[in-house]
Amino acid sequence: MGSLSPWHWAILAVVVIVLFGAKKLPDAARSLGKSLRIFKSEVRELQNENKAEASIETPTPVQSQRVDPSAASGQDSTEARPA
């Protein structure tokens, strides 16, 4: 039980031929082949895209430093400022 005997496959083939007709079966197989080819190419493209993204280095974050304006200009903070 569970496996199909050759008789089951033969009956299934006859039913498919009767339902779809002999002329439509090659067209259906051709269409299925094209669809699988397109699907495979899209999967391959996505894999290449992921590999390209992984190979790109992530930029290092810029470290900001706080500069005291009075120390940067060379003036002492005790000097009087003009009004």
From Swiss-Prot:
It comes from the Bacteria. GO terms for molecular function: protein transmembrane transporter activity. Disruption phenotype: Essential for growth. The keyword Ribonucleoprotein does not apply. GO terms for cellular component: TAT protein transport complex. InterPro entries: TatA/B/E, TatA/E. Residues 48-83 are annotated as: Disordered. It is a single-pass membrane protein. Its main location: membrane. It is found in: Cell membrane. GO terms for biological process: protein transport by the Tat complex. Part of the twin-arginine translocation (Tat) system that transports large folded proteins containing a characteristic twin-arginine motif in their signal peptide across membranes. TatA could form the protein-conducting channel of the Tat system. The Tat system comprises two distinct complexes: a TatABC complex, containing multiple copies of TatA, TatB and TatC subunits, and a separate TatA complex, containing only TatA subunits. Substrates initially bind to the TatABC complex, which probably triggers association of the separate TatA complex to form the active translocon. Belongs to the TatA/E family. This is Sec-independent protein translocase protein TatA.
